[in-house]
Amino acid sequence: MPGGLLLGDEAPNFEANTTIGRIRFHDFLGDSWGILFSHPRDFTPVCTTELGRAAKLAPEFAKRNVKLIALSIDSVEDHLAWSKDINAYNGETPTEKLPFPIIDDKGRDLAILLGMLDPVEKDDNNMPVTARVVFIFGPDKKLKLSILYPATTGRNFDEILRVVDSLQLTGTKPVATPVDWKKGESVMVVPTLSEEEAKQCFPKGVFTKELPSGKKYLRYTPQP
């Protein structure tokens, strides 16, 4: 798949037509975190459930200073008409308004630039459609996380919210989040921090799990 972004890459400052008008990506993001996520096609079952869940969680993302923006190879007109179905699926009034814009990428220019095309799934003209990609950008416009799902597997937007919590915490504190971590649970002290530094950084205390190797790398502390 041509194109694509690596962790640490700056987001391209592209211009695009969306359901809220024409945007320039960096201006849209401003000083916020941003999640750009693509879906294969409008008016399809899995995509409807995904964007419905994203809409439901939009207030939680907003609390975390995160802006959402979706993308597919469909037109703005299709996006707006489909938005009614998404709102109806959520049990809401079937309006054209969602809590985030959707990008019109009919020409696949952005999908190619960002490496979003699915090599397997095709449209009626045998052209590749967009895969289920998630890019999370920090306020510095740099890519902090990327996820790539095939068209047949819907994403878990609660998990995406969880990784935002992890990224925002670990970006400011010398900690890492362990498996299945959720906001408010204990975190792990990064190995580069000495015992003395850890004591100074974490006044709530540091617990070290004893291991057969004798190495003291499993160090936990309450979430700072």
Curated annotation (Swiss-Prot):
Residues 5-169 form the Thioredoxin domain. One of its GO terms (cellular component) is lysosome. It catalyses: a hydroperoxide + 2 glutathione = an alcohol + glutathione disulfide + H2O; a 1,2-diacyl-sn-glycero-3-phosphocholine + H2O = a 1-acyl-sn-glycero-3-phosphocholine + a fatty acid + H(+); a 1-acyl-sn-glycero-3-phosphocholine + an acyl-CoA = a 1,2-diacyl-sn-glycero-3-phosphocholine + CoA; 1-hexadecanoyl-sn-glycero-3-phosphocholine + hexadecanoyl-CoA = 1,2-dihexadecanoyl-sn-glycero-3-phosphocholine + CoA. Irreversibly inactivated by overoxidation of Cys-47 to sulfinic acid (Cys-SO(2)H) and sulfonic acid (Cys-SO(3)H) forms upon oxidative stress. Gene3D superfamilies: Antioxidant, Horf6, Chain A, domain2, Glutaredoxin. One of its GO terms (biological process) is lipid catabolic process. The active site is at 47 (cysteine sulfenic acid (-soh) intermediate), 140 (for phospholipase activity). Changing residue 31 to A: Loss of lysophosphatidylcholine acyltransferase activity, but no effect on phospholipase activity. This is Peroxiredoxin-6. Changing residue 26 to A: Loss of phospholipase activity, but no effect on lysophosphatidylcholine acyltransferase activity. Residues 31-40 are annotated as: Required and sufficient for targeting to lysosomes and lamellar bodies. The modification N6-succinyllysine is found at residue 209. Keywords: Acetylation, Antioxidant, Cytoplasm, Hydrolase, Lipid degradation, Lipid metabolism, Lysosome, Multifunctional enzyme, Oxidoreductase, Peroxidase, Phosphoprotein, Redox-active center, Transferase. It holds the Pfam family AhpC-TSA. The record marks 32 as: Important for phospholipase activity. Its EC number is 1.11.1.27, 3.1.1.4, 2.3.1.23. GO terms for molecular function: 1-acylglycerophosphocholine O-acyltransferase activity; peroxidase activity; peroxiredoxin activity; phospholipase A2 activity. The active site is a conserved redox-active cysteine residue, the peroxidatic cysteine (C(P)), which makes the nucleophilic attack on the peroxide substrate. The peroxide oxidizes the C(P)-SH to cysteine sulfenic acid (C(P)-SOH), which then reacts with another cysteine residue, the resolving cysteine (C(R)), to form a disulfide bridge. The disulfide is subsequently reduced by an appropriate electron donor to complete the catalytic cycle. In this 1-Cys peroxiredoxin, no C(R) is present and C(P) instead forms a disulfide with a cysteine from another protein or with a small thiol molecule. Changing residue 47 to S: No loss of phospholipase or lysophosphatidylcholine acyltransferase activity. Thiol-specific peroxidase that catalyzes the reduction of hydrogen peroxide and organic hydroperoxides to water and alcohols, respectively. Can reduce H(2)O(2) and short chain organic, fatty acid, and phospholipid hydroperoxides. Has phospholipase activity. Can either reduce the oxidized sn-2 fatty acyl group of phospholipids (peroxidase activity) or hydrolyze the sn-2 ester bond of phospholipids (phospholipase activity). These activities are dependent on binding to phospholipids at acidic pH and to oxidized phospholipds at cytosolic pH. Changing residue 140 to A: Loss of phospholipase activity, but no effect on lysophosphatidylcholine acyltransferase activity. MJ33 or lithium;[(2R)-1-hexadecoxy-3-(2,2,2-trifluoroethoxy)propan-2-yl] methyl phosphate inhibits its phospholipase A2 activity. CI-976 or 2,2-Dimethyl-N-(2,4,6-trimethoxyphenyl)dodecanamide inhibits its lysophosphatidylcholine acyltransferase activity. It comes from the Eukaryota. Highly expressed in heart, kidney and liver. Moderate expression in brain and stomach. Very low levels in intestine. The modification Phosphothreonine is found at residues 44, 93, 177. Its main location: cytoplasm.
